[in-house]
Amino acid sequence: MRTWYFSEMAYHPAWEKGLARGSLRVNFPSENMDPREAGTLLNRYLDEFALCDEVGLDIMVNEHHSTATCMTVSVPMALSIIARETKTARLLSLGNPIANRPDPVRVAEEMAWLDCLSGGRIEIGLVKGAPYEIAPANSNPGRLMRRYWEAHDLVIKALSTTTGPFSWEGEFYQYRAVNIWPRPIQQPTPPIWMTGMSVDTGIAAAERGHVVGTLLSGGLAKPMYEAYRKRARELGWTAGPDRMAYAAIIGVGNTREEGLRRANIIADYVRTSPVVAEPFTNPPGYNSVAANVAMLKAGPRPHRMITDRNGVPIDHRTATVEQFMDTETVFAGTPDDVFNQLKAFNQRMGGVGHLLFFGQGGELTHQDAKANISLFGKEVAPRLLQLEVPEQVAAE
């Protein structure tokens, strides 16, 4: 199991005002932040990413827009800085919200450029984007997945074509001459990732051989992984753990109490992330008819719910760190505690090859974040690399 550190790079000083307004995203005015303070935080967060390279961790960066929960507005921009400040860490963009961008060829150019700059260390996430990203992108949710798959195919073709310009005449994108310079070091393309938490996502990723990742989804991850493995077998190949990724909040300390304290602070991201004005939570057409029917049948739920290992639902907004641990969205304690929790999780999931380590969030201090990264990198991550493939998967 490889470990990829990430942080949302939040502007947490504005959270109290956003919570009072009932929305931290889309319609929360930027007058509630101090640009100089934002700059100080961004430089601090970049220092924490650089530390990962020193302790043997890989790095993941994501992006969001019009929100106090994430100040990374451009994955390529952040990764270009990190690529210059690191030497060995692999760098994952998770990801590029291609359905919300008008320029998939530009995405391919940016990723190829980063692959050259980093010496071939880039991995590429092509993601759908959250529902509250639709309004800032001025995007049509009803056509989202059609745009996504066309952009996906165009990005991959642009990255992998080296024999001269090709034209593209699609439903949403038209180009006379696609011919990206420079081309990526990793051929035909750097590794491609997708994200989601549904069986359909698992099947779609398996059909393309992509890595599939899921964020803070608890038990919902296992059916997606199983669907991936099943579809791969139907297509005549075996999907190993290296095709599966899982993102979780992790707090490590010299004592169990210290680890839980750090995890509890980081978990404030999960408690605040769903706080968005209702019109932006489920834009018409964003979810399928079947998904909307299922949500209606489940009854009114103002915020996304997850369940613990006994099927008991918890509310993100009010859950304790112990409740989050019961859902396996949080792992916390001493290095031994965290390793044993992740080892058991890996066994239950049938083998997960990539751990996305949410190691900083909320008001966690710079010193706490550095200690969390260092302890995990030195005392947990090396042992995770030695985890064996669960028996039931190895036998398939």
Regions found by a protein language model. Give the residues of each.
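A conserved active-site cap/scaffold subdomain adjacent to cofactor or substrate pockets
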Residues: 197-219, 223-224, 229, 243
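N-terminal beta1-alpha1-beta2 module of alpha/beta enzyme domains
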Residues: 1-89, 190, 394-396
